[in-house]
Every structure is written in C-alpha cells, then in structure tokens.
Amino acid sequence: MASSSNPAFAHPAFQERSSAQRPGLTPPAAQTQFSTASAQATDAAVHAQLEGAYAAPSAGAIDTGRMTVEDTVLKTVALFGVLLVTAVVGWIWTMAGVTAANPSPSIAPWIIGALGGFVLAMVVTFTSRKKIRPALILAYAAFEGLFIGGISAFFEFVWPGIVVQATLATLSVVGVTLALFASGKVRASKKATKVFMIAMIGYLVFSLINVVMMMFGAFPAGSGGPFGMLSHYSIMGIPLGVIIGVAVVIMAAYSLVLDFDSIQQGVRNGAPRPFAWLGAFGIMVTVVWLYVEILRMIAILRGND
C-alpha cells in the first residue's frame, strides 16, 4: 500500500503492517506453555462458553469497537452536513452588506473560515496520535463551511452560475474516483505516489511564488485577471491556470484514491472506532481542496472569455 499524502492518514493505524504486527494473529508465548492437564481442567468451561457464543448473533466490527467503512461513511456524511449548514451562514453573511451603494460582498466569512479551518486542521493532525477528538473535527467542518459558503458567494457574485458548475464538477470527480476505486480499476501504487508527492511539492512552491509576486504588485489590476500567473500567462491560447488546474484536479483525485486506500487499511488493521472520524476528516480535506481548485479553474476560464 502507498502512503497517503493527506496528514490525516499519517497515523500508524492507517499504515500497512506485517502479519506479526496485527493484534490477535500471533498468540503470546505464555499461552503456548499451558500444560495438557490445565487445558483439560478448563476444557469443559471453555466448551460451554463457546456453545453460548455460537448460539448468539455474531458481533460486527462496530460491536467490537472497531473502525468500519460504513461507520466512516456515516461520519463523512455528518461532517458534510455540518459544512453545508455553516456554508449557508457564510453565504448569507457574505452577501448581507451588498447594496446599490455598496456593491462589494464581504470577504470576512471566508477569511475567518479559512484561518479557523487551517488552525483546527493543524490541531487535529498533530494531536490525533494521542487522542482523537470528534468535537475538534466537527468544529473544523463548521469553519470549512463558513469558508466554502463565503468564497462561493463571492465567486457567484462575480461569475453568476459558477457555484453550480463547480459543485457538479466536484461531485462528478468524486463519484467517478469512488466508482473506479470500488471496482478495483484504480489503486494507489508506490511509484504513482512518488510522482504525486513531487508534483505536490512543485505546485506548493509555484503557489507560494505566485502569492509573493501578487503581494508585491507584479500583476497590476486589470492586467490579466485576479489569479496572478495563473490568469496572466497562457500557453497556445490556454490560460496557465487552466492547464495547471487540470493537473491539480487529477492530483486531488489521486489523493482521494490514497484516502480510500488508507481507510481500507485502517479497517484491515482493526483500528479503534474513533479512527472513523479521522478518515472522514481526511476525505473532507481532500474534497474541499478539489472544490476550491475547480472553482478557481472555472473562474479563470470564464474570465478569459
């Protein structure tokens, strides 16, 4: 199994283990040293207990306190439910001050949401090795909703209809990726993951350079769009942001594959049930990233018309 680049899945519970590392597969040495006499003395009691166990309904992973795919799905749905509720709040807040005299939407909701979400994401990532706190993950979803609602309202104000386009595109990418993964046609590999990590580092460096250049006025207002190099330059008539955007969407889709793979590995490892929250958190991080990248790519395309 290839390791996920998503920090949510950095915990050992989501990493592949050898059979010797998996609990319950190798009996302790002390158990193998019981004498035959002791075994015979307890045989009747053990037999009676086994008869009762066989007669009772089998315990599922949830009954034994283990992480399951189904439980992870339910928690993912819950997180996105919280995100949608606060996204509505962010949208209303962004547009509340728009009037004929003041036609500019507020950027406060998505700035607050982005900063709050980033801080909570770091806290969840670095504290989950000791203890998983669902309340922090739910709070992260709430801040991400504020961010998504705010930035979506802002983009919709500038490019009407863009939110529906970005939402449908995001759902399509997630749906196709999930279907291909479930069918076994797409799987993570160590070689592909190495390429993915190199591409991610390159993209982060490019983004940092782009932001710095924008801060220092390298791209004056009205000289090609609000996204710096992404909207200022083009290759064969295609905006650089669209070319990079397509590559980033592919990267985000592969990141989803890594997320799904990590969740399956966590289930195989018998990770405790709270790790389902961490799996749901990891999926949300990737899907939000995917949506924002698609939103920006469509904005660059429409701004270039």
Model features per residue range: what roles?
Residues 1-305:
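A hydrophobic alpha-helical transmembrane-helix feature that marks the membrane cores
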